[in-house]
A protein has these predicted regions:
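Bacterial N-terminal signal peptides
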Residues: 11-22
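Short, low-complexity N-terminal intrinsically disordered segments enriched in polar/charged residues
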Residues: 25-53, 141-160
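Short solvent-exposed beta->alpha transition segments
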Residues: 41, 49-101
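Short active-site loop at a secondary-structure junction
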Residues: 64, 170-178, 200-260, 299-310, ...
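Exposed beta-sheet edge and beta->alpha loop/turn motif
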Residues: 97-149
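Short, Gly/Ser/Thr-enriched beta-strand-loop segments that form substrate-interacting elements
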Residues: 97-113, 417-458, 466-469
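Short, conserved catalytic-motif segment at the N-terminal edge
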Residues: 153-212, 232-234, 294
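Short, surface-exposed loop or secondary-structure junction motifs
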Residues: 190-197, 250-449
Length: 494
């Protein structure tokens, strides 16, 4: 689950990937003499001045009124924390976006923390002294994968690459979690680093359960597909037909199950101040209906891709109405149980769940200290995210899914038919998808306070990578993507 605005987040994610992928040919770290470049220079000057109070007063003055107040407040807070903790920043890469020339990307490194961040900004054409788009996202050290090969590697070399990278991240205090790799038949890499609980210094190990954020959407999508197979609904059934209690029936009549699965419903997000001020009121899918219906519609259904946690909560309510079971019971019995996922489930914040790690987050990409994420999460996992699992269970899910144990092959093929363009690839029915070395990498990422996760499956071979972490949101999900690329390049042999 992502809390920040999808348009800003999508742009930031795309330019981050572009910046990281092309570091070898990085442009000189000189800010351009453009409106955005001049504003970036002022911003970095204020960060390096080291006066958080001054930054708090100044930063809002360069933001366009068109940026929503919550987004403004979030960006300003990141800048204040960066000013307080970074010890100043050095610019090490500057570039524009190839498809959006006005979009400026500025990669920096904190002098005190050594952490990296990417500023993403665009000046307002009508008011060039204001930023129409402004964000700061974390990024990994650009040199982290510099020595990684592009083609197939031996199993021993893969293990060496993974251990070296995890050790480097752990030594920099940038990774806490587990990473596992399957060759499609057996687990060939299984590594853990960091702490599951910091107060008592409890280490992560192979039994540790992690919240997995939006990986939960895959389980929700599979549950919907099972009900389609059973003839209890169709891909084209409307929200109005399946959830007649949804308050905004006029909108619901034009939204289909297919659109909800693909994030093309036009609905926004429930992560708004009202939700966080009243978290205890939102536990079951039906509890969210009024809140979701009150949020602005972002686009006409079927016309635009907008990542929507709200859409997946509504899918959870659809599962309940159609099956006659609670969403949580249905997924536990019809998805987790047949896949052999005995260590997966949904917990409430007051539950005692053995081996479940505590989530931690930083206030911004350049922040020095962590905080426990208790107050940043839903009271209970929802159909859009925050279930818990282990790497072993996630690999079991990937195998059961590919082998037709959860839905029939024809249904599975339909789920991946005609994905919607999104990011570096596309978004199918509950799964991200991209091509690498002529093969499909399918799965999902998850990132919210206290969680970073990724399941990446090389579909043609069954090889898969599971990464779980009790820190986030962070960019360590990219490590799983790098490994998936190596797996897609060819069979990993001993």
């Amino acid at each position: 689950m992502k809390r920040y605005s999808r348009p800003v987040a999508a742009s930031a994610s795309a330019v981050f990937l572009a910046c990281l992928a092309s570091v070898a040919g990085a442009a000189p770290a000189t800010l351009p003499d453009t409106a955005a470049g001049r504003l970036a220079g002022e911003l970095i000057h204020h960060v390096n001045a080291g006066n958080p109070d001054q930054m708090r007063r100044w930063a809002p003055t360069i933001l366009s009124a068109d940026i929503a107040p919550p987004e403004q407040a979030g960006f300003v807070q990141k800048l204040v924390v960066a000013t307080r903790d970074s010890g100043g920043v050095d610019v090490h890469d500057v570039r524009t976006h190839p498809r959006q020339p006005g979009l400026l990307q500025v990669a920096v490194k904190g002098r005190r923390t050594g952490r990296h961040a990417l500023f993403v900004m665009e000046a307002d054409p009508a008011k060039p002294d204001k930023l129409a788009l402004a964000d700061m996202v974390g990024m990994q050290d650009p040199s982290l994968y510099a020595a990684w090969p592009k083609g197939p590697v031996s199993q021993a070399e893969l293990q060496r690459l993974i251990n070296t990278t995890l050790d480097r991240l752990a030594q920099a205090d940038d990774f806490s979690g587990c990473l596992s790799v399957s060759d499609g038949k057996k687990t060939i890499v299984d590594e853990c680093r960091g702490l599951a609980e910091r107060n008592f210094g409890v280490a992560n190990d192979h039994r540790t359960r992690f919240h997995i954020g939006s990986l939960t959407k895959m389980f929700t999508a599979v549950a919907v597909a099972q009900l389609v197979e059973a003839g209890k609904l169709s891909w084209d059934s409307t929200l109005a037909q399946l959830v007649p209690e949804y308050p905004d029936q006029a909108t619901a009549r034009n939204i289909t199950v297919w659109q909800l699965l693909h994030h093309t419903s036009g609905l926004g997000d429930f992560f708004v101040p009202e939700f966080f001020q009243n978290r205890e009121q939102y536990v079951d899918p039906q509890d969210f209906l009024d809140l979701i219906a009150r949020q602005p519609v972002l686009s006409e259904p079927g016309k635009q891709w907008n990542y929507s946690n709200s859409g997946y909560v509504l899918l959870g309510r659809i599962i309940e109405n159609v099956s006659g079971e609670s969403y949580f019971d249905y997924v536990q019995q019809r998805v987790f149980a047949p896949a052999g996922m005995a260590d997966s489930g949904f917990d409430a914040i007051e539950d005692i769940t053995p081996n479940l790690s505590v989530g931690y987050f930083r206030d911004g990409p350049l922040a020095a200290e962590r905080k426990a994420a208790w107050m940043k999460l839903p009271v209970k996992g929802v159909p859009a995210g925050s279930s818990y699992s282990t790497n072993a269970d996630l690999l079991r899910f990937s195998r059961a899914l590919r082998e037709g144990e959860l839905v029939k092959p024809a249904t599975l093929a339909k789920m991946f038919d005609d994905p919607v363009p999104a990011g570096p690839g596309g978004y199918a029915a509950g799964f991200g998808e991209r091509l690498s070395h002529g093969r499909h990498i399918r799965g999902h990422t998850g990132g919210i306070e206290g969680t970073t996760a990724n399941l990446a499956i090389v579909w043609e071979t069954g090889a898969a990578v599971a990464l779980t972490s009790n820190e986030g949101p962070a960019e360590n999900w990219l490590l799983a993507e790098r490994i998936a690329d190596l797996l897609a390049a060819g069979t990993v042999k001993p």
